Amino acid sequence: MQIGEGTTLVADASVKGLPDIRKTRFDLSVPRLRSTARAVDELALGIAGRKLSDKLVGVLGNSGQIDLNARFRGLLSSFDMQLGAATGVGNVSCNLKMAPVKGGLSSVRGDVETRNLRLGELLDRRDLLGNATLTAYVDGVIGRGVADANVVGNVTQLGFNGYVYDSLRLDGRLRNREFDGRITARDPNLDFDFFGTVDLNDSVPRYDFTMDLRHADLARLHVNRRDSVSQLSGRIVAAAGGRSLDDLNGRIQVTDARYRYNDKEIAAASMTVTGENSERSKFVELRSDFADVTFRSKTSYRTVFEYLRRSAWKYLPMLGGEKWEETPSERKAAVANDFSLLSVNIRNFNPVADAVSTGLQIADGSSLQLLFNPASDQLSLKAASEYIERRRM
């Protein structure tokens, strides 16, 4: 059967139970459905009365010619379905079983598999994404605004940022937008175990997890393109929530961290970041083997950072850059009676300084106190150090 221009359908259907659609049993076999993005868009307009979104049409267009095969057996509320898709960028297969359960919910069980799916071409991100080969299994319930399922995923190939990852696995429970479970990597250049919860259901995301990072080769993963050797390990424990610094509340601790770069190494027994933030009060603190940093304010971090940037250009014009003009909305965002305080105390910081800028040295015991008010443009700086040098200059 030819449907419009560009769509070919071969199908065999059996329907029993009409006119009661709830009790009607379908047995539908589609050995072949061939179409294109343009044809699918026109078909959607003819059937549903509206076109597909531009984004979806773009993705379908990137996939080239689409060949589908499908089998559907059962009621609309209880069925078995198999679906296969062959496209110009790779193949996808899916199996799905659905049946009603108590409380208006439906059980869902299924799997999906891709082999050498060229994600970069499909999503038009060839600069970032490569091929993907993966399998995923789902077993749970959906309905009445609820999605609750156990999910298992295995990635044997994933091209990202010019590197091909393998041996990635996800195993956990997905409740709407909350994941609780385990993620592991056994790639030659990325080896970690993640246990815990990431909850995106509320307006403020919540994190409660432990991550054992045994090995990450940042150079081979193309995360660090500056150093030929760049390897990281450590243990991360996070119990916090927040979308940004302005609403970060909780604690993030890194222990037994080691960073090896070129022929040098940095080790840290403990680093802890604590945040206590609301609309009226800002507090963030870093405690580490290298430095202690405390910041207190009533003004948003964004306003503070923009003010410091403008002040740096004003008082240190040698830094260059474009002239920054404060807008009325930014002046309004600053709290009139607030003096923000940044305190930094340094000890054994040279290994970190050298990693940031080769040859940079800062004396132990160096300190900095910065007191400022963006609303009144008042700034006071107090710094003390026996020496700060870079390559003996």
What are these regions (language model features)?
Residues 1-393:
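Interface amphipathic segments
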